[in-house]
Every structure is written in structure tokens, then in C-alpha cells.
């Protein structure tokens, strides 16, 4: 085999390897997943990993926030992992919504209160809405959703 043949073969190996590397890089960069449509909620301020987090999505004021079992458009229970939780609502039509979230530590499906009616478990609302001597109104917690990907955070209070 002549000297030029070995050089040519070596060059082809290098060129081929570089080409495959470039193809792999382009496929990796080009395959980044776009954000999925839906409402993606990160729950902050969870004090422990006991129980679950309940996220209730409402599209009307009726039943907000305490009547979530009857009136919520979507309800999601997610396990708390290392004091973190995320609720991802998919297939949601564009519109106006409000979110209510509780940290259901005892997993009884409701916000536990003491003898005075004060919450003993964590709770929070979209827009960080707060009520005066009670839960906030739907209007205070409401937000517009356009059908694309919406990310929000809700900080719990205890």
C-alpha cells in the first residue's frame, strides 16, 4: 500500500468521525423538546414530605376554593418528594382560571383546621392571592390562559 493510500484512509476516518459527531450534535440540539401546552405549577414552601399536594383548577367562581370536589374543573393529587411538588394540567382550553393548592399532610382530602377554624395544613392560591378573614375571591386568584405553555409558582402558607 502506498503512502498516499494510508494518508487518504486516515483522512477519511477522521472526516467520517467528525461528520458523525456533527450529525449527533445537530440531532441533540435540534431535538430539544418544546414546552408542552398546559398549566405547569411549581409548589414552593412545602414544610415536609408527608402526605400529598392537591391542586384544584377552577374556571368559575362557584365553589372556589373550598368546594373543589364538586366545582373544580380539574383536580390533581401529587406526592411530595423532598419538599417539592409540581402539578401539570394538560388539555386545558383557553380561558380564565384560578388555582387553589393544599398540602394535605394527613391525606384526608380536605384542608384541616384547628378548633378556631384556622388552617393546620399548607395552602396557597394563584397570583399569591390572599383573603381577609378567609379565602380569597376567584377574581383575586384568577389568571388568563391562552392555550400555550404557562408556568407559575404558588407559595404555600402555614
Explain the meaning of each model-derived region.
Residues 1-9:
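N-terminal secretory signal peptides that target proteins for export/translocation
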Residues 2, 27-61, 110-158:
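Primarily secretory-pathway and cell-envelope proteins
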Residues 11-27:
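Bacterial N-terminal signal peptides
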Residues 56-76:
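Short amphipathic beta-strand segments in non-cytosolic proteins
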Residues 77-83, 145-146:
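Short proline/glycine- and polar residue-rich coil/turn motifs
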Residues 89-91:
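Short, flexible loop/turn segments at beta-strand junctions in immunoglobulin-like
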Residues 95-101:
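A short tyrosine-centered beta-strand micro-motif
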Residues 102-106:
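Acidic, divalent-cation-chelating loop motifs in proteins
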Amino acid at each position: 500500500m502506498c503512502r498516499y493510500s494510508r494518508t487518504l484512509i486516515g483522512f477519511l476516518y477522521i472526516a467520517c468521525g467528525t461528520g458523525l459527531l456533527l450529525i449527533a450534535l445537530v440531532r441533540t440540539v435540534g431535538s430539544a423538546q418544546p414546552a408542552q401546552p398546559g398549566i405547569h405549577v411549581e409548589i414552593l414552601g412545602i414544610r415536609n414530605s408527608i402526605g400529598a399536594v392537591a391542586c384544584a383548577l377552577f374556571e368559575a367562581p362557584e365553589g372556589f376554593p373550598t368546594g373543589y370536589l364538586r366545582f373544580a374543573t380539574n383536580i390533581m393529587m401529587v406526592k411530595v418528594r423532598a419538599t417539592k411538588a409540581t402539578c401539570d394540567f394538560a388539555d386545558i382550553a383557553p380561558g380564565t382560571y384560578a388555582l387553589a393548592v393544599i398540602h394535605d399532610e394527613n391525606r384526608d382530602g380536605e384542608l384541616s383546621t384547628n378548633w378556631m377554624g384556622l388552617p393546620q395544613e399548607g395552602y396557597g392560591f394563584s397570583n399569591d392571592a390572599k383573603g381577609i378573614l378567609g379565602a380569597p375571591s376567584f377574581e383575586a386568584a384568577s389568571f388568563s390562559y391562552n392555550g400555550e405553555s404557562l408556568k407559575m409558582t404558588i407559595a404555600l402558607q402555614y
